[in-house]
Amino acid sequence: MTENVPQGQITMPLQQGGAREISPQALAVADYLRSHKLLKQRPGILNGKRSDFFRVKRAIRALEDPKYKQLQSKPNSKLPPINSRNEAISIFRLMPINQMALRVDKLPTQTALMMKQKPEQGVPVLQVNPQQEFGDDMYYTWFYNPVPLTTYLYGALGVAAIFAGVLFPLWPIFLRQGVWYLSVGMLGLIGVFFGIALVRLVIFVLTWPTVKPGIWIFPNLFADVGFVDSFIPLWAWHGTPERDLLPQKFKNKKKKKNAGTVIESKEPPRKLTKEEKQKQKEANAQMEQMQAAFQTQLSSFATQMQQIKEMSDSGIDPQIIAAQLQAQYPPDKQAAIKLENEQAQAKLDERIRELAAQIQDKTNANKTGDKIEEVADKENKEAPKRIVTLEDANDE
């Protein structure tokens, strides 16, 4: 099976419809990938239910694994042959075509909460993407969930337990006593669980009006987690902040990332002196003058461009138009424009240095760097709008 599929992203719209017959090759590939260790599947929440998802590049690695060739070489194997990456991508396309695995997107926690989803710690909320693409870092989730062998074993054990319960009158006395003690112990555990739930509700009701938004003890008590994780953390405020839903490793990364940042002060802004207000007015006036000059030059260029367009539409030779443009910008005028731009840039740099010196004198050292960068960035962003270079004029 050879198909020239380019590497990277391949778009395929999601097909809507009812149940369809699954090809034997797709079923064999799904059985091979479903439990492969190279897939590194993780749990996610799709439509309120747990669903394993994985990256496309890991599925391609699993299909290129030598173990696949060994299984495919067996006489009764239904696995299609794979000899290149393009063929591996073509084989993986059988998953969305047969709707056994579809592309999904991981939703940000805030978006999931707005959609009334309930993300859990380390378990992101997933959403099916209508465009089924095959980029290396894209995610796919399984819609093919074969019944494992353990399910049949549990079913057989359930039938055996029911049969043994029917024969309870025939049990020996020591077995009957053991079952009675076990039943009492289980009822006691259930009672303790309901007692904890009642106590945490009472504590929340008492703390909600006094210490808003209220406190829950064992906030994960009813979450879909393990027994030990149900009691961790010990308490939490009502509501689930976005940071609390992140795994611990992401919290540590955030701490390291924000370790060197300076916390902004909550002090009220300092009032400007008369001298500073006067300098600010002068600076604003200079800015307005430069903007007016820029608008004048822009209008002039627009007029010239309109004239050039009219000349071009009338059939004038382009060489004549170029000669006229050259006449409008003789060498002495070009030198004057260049000198004017250099002077404007020098004034701009001088103004930035003055503002930096004022901030250095009037503020503490922790805030100086941020404010200088803010002023410099603002001035530099405005500079291209005020200075029209000769190259831009010639390009137009």
Curated annotation (Swiss-Prot):
InterPro entries: Sec62, Sec62_asco. The keyword Protein transport applies. It is a multi-pass membrane protein. Keywords: Endoplasmic reticulum, Membrane, Protein transport, Translocation, Transmembrane, Transmembrane helix, Transport. Residues 1-154, 200-396 are cytoplasmic. It comes from the Eukaryota. GO terms for biological process: post-translational protein targeting to membrane, translocation. Residues 252-288, 360-396 are annotated as: Disordered. It is found in: Endoplasmic reticulum membrane. Residues 264-282, 368-389 have a biased composition (Basic and acidic residues). Its main location: endoplasmic reticulum. Residues 176-178 are lumenal. GO terms for cellular component: endoplasmic reticulum; endoplasmic reticulum membrane; membrane. NCBIfam families: sec62. Part of a complex that contains SEC61, SEC62, SEC63, SEC66 and SEC72. Belongs to the SEC62 family. PANTHER family: TRANSLOCATION PROTEIN SEC62. Required for preprotein translocation. This is Translocation protein SEC62.
